[in-house]
A protein has these predicted regions:
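Eukaryotic scaffold repeat domains enriched in small/polar residues
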Residues: 1-120
Length: 120
């Protein structure tokens, strides 16, 4: 669950492999994603975080990656590397973004927190 600067609520649906967005009054606005491993597809999306520019980060437990989208749900990029080395994931879950834009990833399978400095 994440809330953008306009108060819209973004919900990751672990069982339905999608993201849904609602306005502050709870009215459905849009959704994106489906089950799979391609760009814009999900396998058990978990964490959500939104940066100061409205960019949406989604952690995927099933695909061991982080996908990045614009506020409308258009795929921008991904961080994808399964394993236990630097920058690799095993069942990423929680996400957070600090005031500098650094992205924190709770990497459950590797029992650690990873920090990324995203580039445009």
């Amino acid at each position: 669950l994440a809330i953008d600067s306009e108060g819209n609520v973004y919900v990751s649906e672990y069982g339905n492999d999608r993201i849904q967005v609602f306005n502050p009054q709870g009215r459905f606005l849009r959704k994106w994603g489906s089950e799979g491993s391609g760009d814009g597809e999900f396998s058990r999306p978990q964490g959500l975080a939104i940066d100061g520019e409205g960019i949406v980060y989604v952690s995927e437990y099933g695909n061991d990656r982080i996908q990045v989208f614009d506020p409308q749900g258009r795929f921008l990029r991904k961080w994808e590397s399964e394993g236990n080395g630097d920058g690799e994931f095993s069942q990423p879950q929680g996400l957070a973004i600090d005031s500098d834009g650094d992205v924190y990833v709770s990497d459950q399978g590797n029992h650690r927190i990873l920090v990324f400095k995203p580039t445009v």
